């Protein structure tokens, strides 16, 4: 039992220097980041749509998707604000399987972390500079935050990480919105405790030194459904659950109440077409209740170029992890959201 060094110490500064945003690209990102913050705080009433592939396994397929999404964003910009999922690290239930671009930048070759780190920055950089979109990623490894803190505009803490103290404390120092998912058990208290920790100042050791954070007022809820003790999925985007979550926001006195509905995972039972119904039902719930309309203001949707999933990367733009909506269904769903909001 041991840690075995497999290479020299990685120079993160040198890797970041290769993909620094130009002054023009930085201005674009900062403008979009301000818009996103205004949406999170309620100053901007547009719907947030965090959307993109389950995992970013193929740079060219992801870029093709990003170009299409950028064009779609322009069509719906007055009602919907899109941040593209560029998810580069994937949690695995038992440690097996594809772990994301950071581990394996080329799915036909053996894992390579040094190449993976470069590939992660390259992909976020290209999406921003070539499409004008900004990006979201899952903070699976808090120690890797320094790799992308200047590029990623939205961070998510996953269902398996939300109870972890380091994730919570690091989230409290991030200068960007952090969505915190309910755990797979569905326990909303665990998630809200995580949000409380993230919204408050914390002192801890990070990268070898003692740090104090300012607290992150944009830490917020992502409802992703749950799995019960019998292994059956239990959605939590329903009317009563939303009111329960809103009541917890009020009781705990948290800042900027905001609920994002994860339309896949256990809200859809990983039946990718069900994502459309989840969105539709949530929009109805918003119409029925003013508190829900004021607080439930976003969706996280898994979508790619081709419908479904595959075990091996044979079809260009088809997920190799969770099944996703293909492009035609993605476009139709976004247009349906837009039409509903325009009524």
Regions found by a protein language model. Give the residues of each.
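Glycine-rich phosphate/diphosphate-binding loops that line cofactor/substrate pockets in enzymes
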Residues: 37-45, 251-256
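N- or domain-start disorder-to-order transition segments that initiate the globular core
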Residues: 1-43
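Internal helix-turn-beta structural module
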Residues: 303-341
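Active-site-facing alpha/beta catalytic cores
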Residues: 66, 79-244, 265-270, 274-281, ...
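Long, contiguous binding/interaction regions
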Residues: 26-29, 57, 92, 130
């Amino acid at each position: 039992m041991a840690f075995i060094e497999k290479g020299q110490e990685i120079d993160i500064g040198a890797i970041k220097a290769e993909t620094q945003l130009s002054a023009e690209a930085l201005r674009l990102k900062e403008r979009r980041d301000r818009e996103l913050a205004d949406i999170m705080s309620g100053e901007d009433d547009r719907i947030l749509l965090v959307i993109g592939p389950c995992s970013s396994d193929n740079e060219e397929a992801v870029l093709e998707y990003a170009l299409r999404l950028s064009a779609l964003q322009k069509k719906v910009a007055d009602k919907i604000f899109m941040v593209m999922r560029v998810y580069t690290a994937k949690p695995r239930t038992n440690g097996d399987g594809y772990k994301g671009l950071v581990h394996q930048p080329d799915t036909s070759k053996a894992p390579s972390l040094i190449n993976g780190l470069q590939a992660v920055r390259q992909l976020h950089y290209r999406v921003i500079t070539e499409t004008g979109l900004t990006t979201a990623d899952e903070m699976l490894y808090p120690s890797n935050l320094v790799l992308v803190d200047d590029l990623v505009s939205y961070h998510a803490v996953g269902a398996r990480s939300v109870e972890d103290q380091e994730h919570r404390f690091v989230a409290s120092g991030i200068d960007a919105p952090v969505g915190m998912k309910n755990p797979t058990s569905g326990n909303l208290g665990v998630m809200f405790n995580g949000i409380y920790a993230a919204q408050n100042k914390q002192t801890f050791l990070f990268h070898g030194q003692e740090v104090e954070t300012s607290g992150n007022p944009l830490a917020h809820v992502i409802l992703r459904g749950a799995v019960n003790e019998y292994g059956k999925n239990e959605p939590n985007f329903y009317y009563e659950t939303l009111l329960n979550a809103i009541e917890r926001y009020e009781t705990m006195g948290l800042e900027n109440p905001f609920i994002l509905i994860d339309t896949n995972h256990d809200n859809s039972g990983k039946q990718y077409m069900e994502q459309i119904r989840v969105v539709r039902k949530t929009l109805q719930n918003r119409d029925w209740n003013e508190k829900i309309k004021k607080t439930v203001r976003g969706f996280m949707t898994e979508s790619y170029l081709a419908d479904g999933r595959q075990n091996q990367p044979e079809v260009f733009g088809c997920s190799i992890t969770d099944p996703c909506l293909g492009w035609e269904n993605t476009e139709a769903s976004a247009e349906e959201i837009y039409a509903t909001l325009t009524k």
